[in-house]
Amino acid sequence: MRYRALVALLLAMCVGFLTACSEEPISLLSDETYTYDQIRNTGLANSCPQLPETARGSFDLDSETGYILTDLCLEPTSYFVKEESTNKREEAKFIGAKALTRYTSSLDQVTGDLTLDSNGVLTFEEQYGIDFQAITVQLPGGEQVPMLFTIKKLVATTAEGQTGISTSTDLTGDYIVPSYRGASFLDPKARGQATGYDNAVALPAAADDEEIMRENVKETPVLDGNISLQVSKVKSETGEIAGIFEAIQASDTDLGSKEPVDVKIRGLFYGRVEPKA
């Protein structure tokens, strides 16, 4: 009887495995609609729409017409943290990291102005949208690095001589990285920038000590980031574009108590160009 139960269990597991493998993966093509049941519990809600591999077109833009880049979505796929080498003769290099924040990492519904000047320079200026996500990544040694992935106030431009958007269009620019935590956040000792204690209650006499001053004086610094958007797919009929991006930005400073480190984020992006209403 025991062997029969074990065999039945193994058969059930094999059937379940084969059934799961036989299902075709869902591809989030931009021109298809999906039901709630297709998306639920799959993690696809964090994925950006995609364009087919055959989308290799281009479209022209008029320098006298205003445009917007809307529904911009950026989906991170890999992370790297810059670490100093133990050998002083070697330069710091980026180390691959694993994301601990699994299903809430993409930026979405971002909109901004898109203009083409008389010199053929295409400029995108981010205005609003879901333009930040709190993400934590883990290095191979176990160290965790929190950061605020964002493109707030991004101003990205192309080289001169552009007449529109094609699969060779590259947009590069800088943006700001707000503090991971706000001024009203309290640390475990109830210290904050805008509220809470000025110093640790257990050490009032040592509040001005240089070693703990940085922990007591909270700051919410605004740091910098840089991103490159490389268009690789264009659907000229609908104005849709897609491609890859690479961003390098600062990590969290724990309200000013730690030095930020550079984090490199790579991934996919999607957007749609429309004339301004």
Describe each PLM feature range:
Residues 17-20:
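C-terminal motif of bacterial Sec signal peptides marking the signal peptidase cleavage site
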Residues 1-9:
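Bacterial N-terminal signal peptides that target proteins for export
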Residues 182-258:
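Acidic, glycine-rich flexible loop segments
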Residues 26-209:
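An ectodomain-focused feature that recognizes extracytoplasmic/extracellular
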Residues 22-24:
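Bacterial signal peptide processing site
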Residues 141, 153-155, 233-235, 245-251, ...:
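Beta-strand elements of well-folded, non-transmembrane domains
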